[in-house]
A protein has these predicted regions:
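Glycoside hydrolase catalytic-domain groove-lining segments
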Residues: 102-108, 121-197, 203-208, 212-226
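Aromatic- and glycine-enriched glycan-recognition loops and surfaces
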Residues: 1-5, 44-47
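Active-site beta-loop-alpha junctions enriched in small/polar residues
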Residues: 16-20, 68-73, 112-117, 141-146, ...
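Active-site cleft segment of glycoside hydrolase catalytic domains centered on the general acid/base Glu
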Residues: 23-136, 149-158, 244-252
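Conserved, mostly hydrophobic/aromatic
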Residues: 14, 66, 139, 173, ...
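A structural motif corresponding to the C-terminal end of an alpha-helix
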Residues: 3-11, 51-63, 95-109, 132-135, ...
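Glycine-rich, aromatic-flanked loop segments that form ligand/cofactor-binding clefts
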Residues: 4-20, 230-231
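Aromatic-rich peripheral "rim/lid" segments of glycoside hydrolase catalytic domains that contact
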Residues: 160, 179-213, 217-225, 230-285
Length: 285
């Protein structure tokens, strides 16, 4: 956060509320909260949110956006906050939101789901929580062209949900390969098959072309409700022992993905750490 602010940039803080990555496949309660439930768990969420933001503010580091949960399509803090237990989930979200509003009243709050082209899922999720009057500002969505379909489908969903729920929208995660080389990394995601699916060549020029098209798509959302894009993960270089999870971490989370650097060929830097053209030219997009 300090380096970001020193570089003249704003930042979004993303609370996962877990000891590990949180996404639709895993939303595991922190070990320290394992025995907590109900109001006790809600209080823990609130206090953790407040304490984290206080610590940042003590260093004059104030996020302009705060994401309460990461890819919470199926809920958060399982099993208490499963999406099927909508009331519990909503109360946990409200606890985090309350902490943000108290400590960073000017920060805009983001609720983030995955699969940004799935309009049915977005409608179902936000309709399901509508009766709880969650106090948030922005709907964030993950969009990976090799998994989630076309930019036109993304735009259709953004137009619909921004209007239906009167919220701004942004792409909270995206990436695409600048090569299909694996660099000897275990578990690398992007492949020649993905290159064919996206229609963009797996080159620096293809990566830049995709981002230009994505930026243009978000800018074209009706009523200027599309406000931005976050790239994930721009700086995972193929260096020795770089991994998204240790073996012990994977075992703890019961995650079956191969440990290693899964995103190296989708970074915004090449294998030698030089900025790709997409990053160099981003301000012109």
């Amino acid at each position: 956060a300090e380096r970001t602010v020193q570089s003249g940039m704003d930042f979004m803080l993303d609370f996962h509320y877990s000891d590990f990555w949180a996404d639709p496949a895993k939303q595991v309660k922190p070990k320290a909260w394992k025995e907590l439930s109900g109001e006790a768990l809600e209080t823990a969420v609130y206090l953790h949110t407040v304490d984290t933001l206080k610590a940042l503010k003590n260093h004059k580091l104030v996020p302009t956006m705060v994401q309460v949960g990461n890819e919470i399509t199926k809920g958060l803090l399982w099993p208490d906050g499963y999406i099927e237990q909508t009331e519990n989930m909503a109360h946990l979200l409200q606890a985090g939101i309350k902490g943000v509003r108290e400590e960073c009243p000017d920060a805009r709050i983001v609720l983030h789901l995955d699969f940004g082209t799935d309009n049915k899922m977005y409608r179902q999720w936000f309709d399901q929580v509508s009766s709880y009057a969650l106090d948030f500002d922005i709907i964030g969505m993950s969009y990976y062209p090799h998994w989630n379909g076309s930019l036109s489908l993304l735009l259709d969903n953004m137009n619909d949900i921004s209007s239906r729920y009167d919220k701004d929208v942004l792409v909270a995660e995206t990436s695409i390969g600048y090569t299909t080389e694996t660099f000897g990394c275990n578990g690398i995601v992007y492949s020649k098959e993905h290159e064919k699916i996206t229609g963009y060549p797996a080159t620096q020029q293809g990566q830049e072309a995709f981002l230009r098209d994505l930026f243009a798509t978000v800018r074209s959302v009706n009523n200027k409700r599309g406000i931005g894009v976050f790239y994930w993960e721009p700086a995972w270089l193929p260096i020795p022992d770089c991994t998204w999870a240790s073996k012990s971490g994977s075992k703890y989370m019961k995650d079956k993905m191969t440990a290693g650097n899964a995103m190296a060929n989708m970074a915004l830097f090449d294998e030698n750490g030089n900025a790709n053209s997409a990053l160099i030219n981003m301000k012109t997009m």
